[in-house]
């Protein structure tokens, strides 16, 4: 009904309706301009393939999926049983932190590629590793000296 009332004339006028310039207080600044497009060697040289590593490609993707799927029963079991066990808290904490680390590592790889940021890329990887270790230590302290991960989530959920 709406289409028949508006008709095709409204589609032609749609450019005028949506031609509003967005409000912006800053100009576009290219912080990291793109590198020059160059070819190493000649055009007739054979392509150099990178070294094959099991930490990249399909093995890495499969490991990420296994970690993500392993979290499902670890979250559901304490919810259905209503109780939490320290071993379940430890397993959930390890898989949750590993899942987060792998996700943030993908972000670091995407936004700070090693071929472009030769010094910043390793620094960002080490910052991520340090934050992951600090998170592991913090969750270990929370699980051993406090109420535990699943009880903490339950209290947050009910508050």
Curated annotation (Swiss-Prot):
Keyword Iron tagged: yes
Mitochondrial intermembrane side: 83-89, 141-159
Positions annotated to bind a ubiquinone: 111
Pfam families for this protein: CybS
Molecular functions per Gene Ontology: heme binding; metal ion binding; protein-membrane adaptor activity; ubiquinone binding
GO terms for cellular component: mitochondrial inner membrane; mitochondrion; respiratory chain complex II (succinate dehydrogenase); TIM22 mitochondrial import inner membrane insertion complex
Regions of this protein lying in the Mitochondrial matrix compartment: 31-65, 110-122
Transit peptide stretch: 1-30
Domain of life: Eukaryota
Pathway: Carbohydrate metabolism; tricarboxylic acid cycle
Induction entry: Expression is down-regulated under conditions of iron depletion.
Transmembrane segments: 66-82, 90-109, 123-140
InterPro entries hit by this protein: CybS (IPR007992), SQR/QFR_C/D (IPR034804)
Summary of the function given for this chain in its UniProt record: Membrane-anchoring subunit of succinate dehydrogenase (SDH) that is involved in complex II of the mitochondrial electron transport chain and is responsible for transferring electrons from succinate to ubiquinone (coenzyme Q).
Protein name (database record): Succinate dehydrogenase [ubiquinone] cytochrome b small subunit, mitochondrial
Gene designation: sdh4
């Amino acid at each position: 009904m709406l289409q028949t009332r508006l008709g095709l004339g409204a589609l032609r006028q749609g450019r005028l309706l949506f031609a509003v310039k967005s409000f912006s207080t800053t100009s576009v600044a290219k912080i990291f301009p793109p590198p020059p497009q160059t070819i190493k060697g000649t055009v007739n040289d054979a392509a150099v393939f990178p070294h094959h590593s099991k930490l990249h490609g399909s093995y890495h993707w499969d490991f990420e999926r296994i970690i993500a799927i392993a979290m499902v029963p670890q979250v559901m079991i304490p919810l259905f049983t209503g109780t939490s066990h320290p071993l379940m808290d430890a397993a959930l904490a390890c898989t949750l932190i590993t899942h987060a680390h792998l996700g943030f590592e993908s972000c670091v790889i995407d936004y700070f590629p090693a071929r472009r940021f030769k010094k910043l890329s390793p620094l960002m990887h080490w910052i991520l590793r340090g934050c992951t270790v600090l998170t592991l230590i913090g969750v270990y302290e929370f699980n051993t000296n406090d109420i535990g991960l699943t009880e903490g989530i339950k209290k947050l959920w009910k508050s």
